[in-house]
Structure formats: structure tokens, C-alpha cells
Amino acid sequence: MPEYQNIFTTVQVRAPAYPGVPLPKGSLPRIGKPIFSYWAGKIGDAQIGPIYLGFTGTLSIIFGFMAIFIIGFNMLASVDWNIIQFVKHFFWLGLEPPAPQYGLTIPPLSEGGWWLMAGFFLTMSILLWWVRTYKRAEALGMSQHLSWAFAAAIFFYLSLGFIRPVMMGSWAEAVPFGIFPHLDWTAAFSIRYGNLYYNPFHMLSIAFLYGSALLFAMHGATILAVSRFGGDREIDQITDRGTAAERAAIFWRWTMGFNASMESIHRWAWWCAVLTVITAGIGILLTGTVVENWYLWAIKHGVAPAYPEVVTAVDPYATATGVTQ
């Protein structure tokens, strides 16, 4: 009998194509016929399709493509419509927000209006996809853990691009679209406000980020390690602990001093992941609105040391008398 000894899926289970649960009356139909992919089966379910978008999903895709279209063509226009230069400099191209003098008004298209329009379409796309996530879970009788986790990520996105700029009174405070431009913005933002590493909510966000990465890795590794004992049947072992759950628990106690249960590990990971973006969003909203310089704030509250002033050397050639030559 095959055993799960590899970090990659070595056994693919092929069942007859399943179209999905019956749709409620009035729903849009599913699109396409189900197909099977060997390579998709290496990392997950081998069946692809049929796809159900529904009304909100279709609108989300349309708005998303409009945002990508606006951003892409503005990037292409910035290199004089040269496809070769577009590909060559793609990572450096961006769509910048309006200049500070425009405040929260609607600027001309060429001076930030396109950024505002792209941001609107992108935000609508994301919000509509959240509605789709909520409604699909509701239709399937599922709890809303995924939709609320997605909402936490949307809160962070809106904090950067909408809520904080409105609080600061200027769209110029928002993040540009583009790969390197948004990374440059992040570095400049941290320098401008006295180093974000001294922001306690940034500290919490990084702690939860590392924590969620560690928990997901530990959980995945543990379940793979006890899958030969039926550890992959986690739902069953939540209420009826078998040898896999017992072995996993005692291994955690031996190596960590405490252990999660088959149920609690998922809640730990969910909360760590959700709190990563919630604390990050709070830290962003406090920056510039409540705290102007995080380094000075850290010194005031005993988080960072107050470094003494260093005595500077005097250049004798810069003095009036000079020195003997």
C-alpha cells in the first residue's frame, strides 16, 4: 500500500468528475466542463472546473480587468508606447497617485486621475469578490471563517490606499501602483515617519506573520508525518482521537513543551494570519495621524535608547587660524 513519504503528493486519487452541489433557482450556470490535470494533482485536486462566477463574480472580474487595463496602458504610455521598453522596464514602471496640492479632489487624468480611477475599479473588484466569497460560503452551508479573514486583508488594503489618505487629507499619501514603485514608497514612508520598525503595531504584525508561517509549517509537517496513521483525517480525529492525534500531541509536547489539538491548531493559524493584517492596518492608520516620528515615540516610551550626541571632529582647515604647515 502506498505511503505518504514525500513532501510532494505521490498518490493521486481520480474520482469521476463532480460538477458540484445543485445551484439554487435563479443562479447563473456553471461554466465549462470538468477536466483533469496531472500537474494540478501534484499539489492539489486534479479536477479543474466547472467554474461558477455568478453575478458578483462576473462583475468582480470585469472591474478587475478594467483596473489592470488602466494601470497597464498608463505604464505603456510612460515608455512612449514602446512594447520592448515596457517589457524591459516593467518592474520599474508605475502609476503614481495625485500630487499633494490636489488634496482629496479629483485631479486631471494625466496628473493622478488615472490612479484614482484604477483604485476605484480595483477596490470594487476586491469588495465584490468578498461578497462572492461570503455568499458562496452561505450557499454551501459553511461558516464564514474565510470571508472574515479576507475582510481583514481588505481592511489593510483600504488602510493604505483609502482610509489613511482621507485621514491625512491627501491622495498623495496613498501607495502607487507598480512593483518597484510601491517598494520604494514603503522605504520612503518608513524613513519619513522615523522608521516603522519602532511602530509597536508593526512589531506585532511581524510577530504574527512569523508566527503564522511557523504554525502552518509545523501543522503541515506534523500531519504529513502521521498521515500513515490516518492523520490526514483531521476532522474525524477532532472528536474521536486516534493514534495519529496522540502521536502528534506527544511529539509536540516532547519538542515544544505543549501541544495543540486537531481543532485548536487551525484556530491558532487563523488568528495569527488575521492579526497580521489587522495590526498592520492599525499601525498604518496611526502613522502620520497620531505619531509623526516613531523613533522619537520609541525613545519617549523607553522602547529605543536615546543615543548621546557624538562630538564632531573640527577640521583645522575650516577654522580661522588654521594650523602650522
UniProtKB/Swiss-Prot annotation:
Tell me where it mainly resides. Answer: membrane
Q: Which stretch is the leader sequence?
A: none
Q: Which residues are involved in binding (7R,8Z)-bacteriochlorophyll b?
A: 182, 202
For this entry, list what GO says about its biological process.
Answer: photosynthetic electron transport in photosystem II
Binding positions for a ubiquinone per the UniProt entry: 252
Q: How does it sit in the membrane?
A: Multi-pass membrane protein
Q: Which keywords, in A-to-Z order, does the entry hold?
A: Bacteriochlorophyll, Chlorophyll, Chromophore, Electron transport, Iron, Magnesium, Membrane, Metal-binding, Photosynthesis, Reaction center, Transmembrane, Transmembrane helix, Transport
Pull one GO CC term from this UniProt entry.
plasma membrane light-harvesting complex
One Pfam family name is: Photo_RC
Q: Where does Fe cation bind?
A: 219, 234, 266
Q: Where in the cell is it found?
A: Cellular chromatophore membrane
Q: Which GO terms describe its molecular function?
A: bacteriochlorophyll binding; electron transporter, transferring electrons within the cyclic electron transport pathway of photosynthesis activity; metal ion binding
Spell out the family assignment given in the record's similarity comment. Belongs to the reaction center PufL/M/PsbA/D family.
NCBIfam families per the UniProt record, alphabetical: pufM (TIGR01115)
Q: How does it assemble?
A: Reaction center is composed of four bacteriochlorophylls, two bacteriopheophytins, two ubiquinones, one iron, and two highly hydrophobic polypeptide chains (designated L and M).
Protein's recorded name: Reaction center protein M chain
Source organism per entry reads Allochromatium vinosum (strain ATCC 17899 / DSM 180 / NBRC 103801 / NCIMB 10441 / D)
